[in-house]
Amino acid sequence: MRYLNKIVFLNSAHIPYSEIQLDGNVHFIGTQGVGKSTLLRAILFFYNADKLRLGIPKEKRSYDEFYLPYANSFIVYEVMRENGPYCVMAFKQQGRVAYRFIDAPYQSSWFVNERREVRADWISIRKAIGTETQISRIVVSYQEFRDIIFGNNRRPDLIGFRKYAIVESPNYQNIPRTIQNVFLNSKLDADFIKDTIIRSMNEEEVNIDLDVYRNQTKDFEQNYNDVTLWLDLSLIHISE
């Protein structure tokens, strides 16, 4: 099973550093203004990658400005999978969120140096991660990010990203919408849930050529009869 295991804020949303485990039933409590909505929106953005559908009021600062205000601002998502976790590093490039996939469990030493400062340049972060860990190219398209996460990865340029899918569905569009409605307390009717399940299924048409199986069965039957006849004749010959 694959799931979002941890979220890490580094100089993000007024948070100098925080690691939050998400690997179970998590209950967020606190008075108004302590950061519950801030955390939930960052989690939701992992699933829908849509800054216009995070429930941020128009009068508030944009997602990019609030969550990634500095060159050394990052949000890291650690995703658990069957063969070990990987990370999604979210950062700001040319004024908007971009991503890199890191094929290893999260380590704070990647981003925080010996002086307990968050690194700002990619070269030093890459050096801290090490050459043995596989790191993806930069993903700047939110549509491409959703395709990677939800398994719509049959294009040649996404072959290297297949191991990062949390589900495998080329028709996943209603899945992030459903998660979004849950996070934003929107209406979820039965028809929408049913449609989501149907569309998330693999709709590849599987054609079965019955003639092939019919011929194979016929050949097997003929061979079986020949062997049986040979054995019967051999037994008769021995008895004589």
Residue ranges of each PLM-predicted region?
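Glycine-rich phosphate-binding loops of NTPases
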Residues: 85-186
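Interface faces of extended alpha-helical assemblies
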Residues: 226, 230-233
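Generic detector of ordered secondary-structure context
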Residues: 35, 185-189
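Mid-to-C-terminal oligomerization/interaction "stalk" domains of large proteins
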Residues: 189, 194-225
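Conserved small/polar residues in nucleotide/adenosyl-binding loops
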Residues: 236-238
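Conserved aromatic-histidine-acidic binding/catalytic patches
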Residues: 27, 31, 181, 185, ...
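Extreme N-terminal "head/tail" segments of very large remodeling/mechanoenzyme assemblies
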Residues: 1-120
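Amphipathic alpha-helical surface "interface" segments used
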Residues: 63-67, 171, 175, 218-225
